[in-house]
Amino acid sequence: MARIAGVDLPRDKRIEAALPYIYGIGWSLSREILKKTGIDPDTRVRDLTEEQVAKLREVIDHEYKVEGDLQREVQMNIKRLIEIGCYRGLRHRRGLPVRGQRTKTNARTRKGPRRTVAGKKKAK
């Protein structure tokens, strides 16, 4: 089993489909990395040689921010927005959508489950 950037890649998948298991690498970046290393995208992970795995590991570690480093950078960016008190920082702090989406309805992913508010009493 190939272990790259602290992630065990699934043995039975093609290397092109296995690389996106690493946080920060999607399909297009996966193809770009394989082109740089000269590895055929249709190769299965189990069929990679140690030399190919080492080449992949070197390219990913030296040229791209992935996994923990990338997650840390994203968190630091959010923390900076909150500290400077900008609008985006306030939205992050309040747990609301940051990019201008509506909040009268929807936005449940950001806001979490509904909190029921007591209704008005019916007048007699």
From Swiss-Prot:
Listed Pfam families: Ribosomal_S13 (PF00416)
One GO BP annotation of this record: translation
Superkingdom per UniProt: Bacteria
Protein family (similarity comment): Belongs to the universal ribosomal protein uS13 family.
GO molecular function: rRNA binding; structural constituent of ribosome; tRNA binding
SUPFAM superfamilies documented for this protein: S13-like H2TH domain (SSF46946)
GO cellular component: cytosol; small ribosomal subunit
Function according to Swiss-Prot or TrEMBL: Located at the top of the head of the 30S subunit, it contacts several helices of the 16S rRNA. In the 70S ribosome it contacts the 23S rRNA (bridge B1a) and protein L5 of the 50S subunit (bridge B1b), connecting the 2 subunits; these bridges are implicated in subunit movement. Contacts the tRNAs in the A and P-sites.
InterPro entries referenced in this protein's UniProt entry, alphabetically: Rbsml_uS13_C, Ribosomal_uS13, Ribosomal_uS13-like_H2TH, Ribosomal_uS13_bac-type, Ribosomal_uS13_CS
Transmembrane segments: none
Gene: rpsM
Segments of this protein annotated with the region Disordered: 96-124
Keyword terms of this UniProt record: Ribonucleoprotein, Ribosomal protein, RNA-binding, rRNA-binding, tRNA-binding
Name the UniProt record assigns to this protein: Small ribosomal subunit protein uS13
UniProt keyword annotation of Ribonucleoprotein present: yes
Summary of subunit composition and partner proteins: Part of the 30S ribosomal subunit. Forms a loose heterodimer with protein S19. Forms two bridges to the 50S subunit in the 70S ribosome.
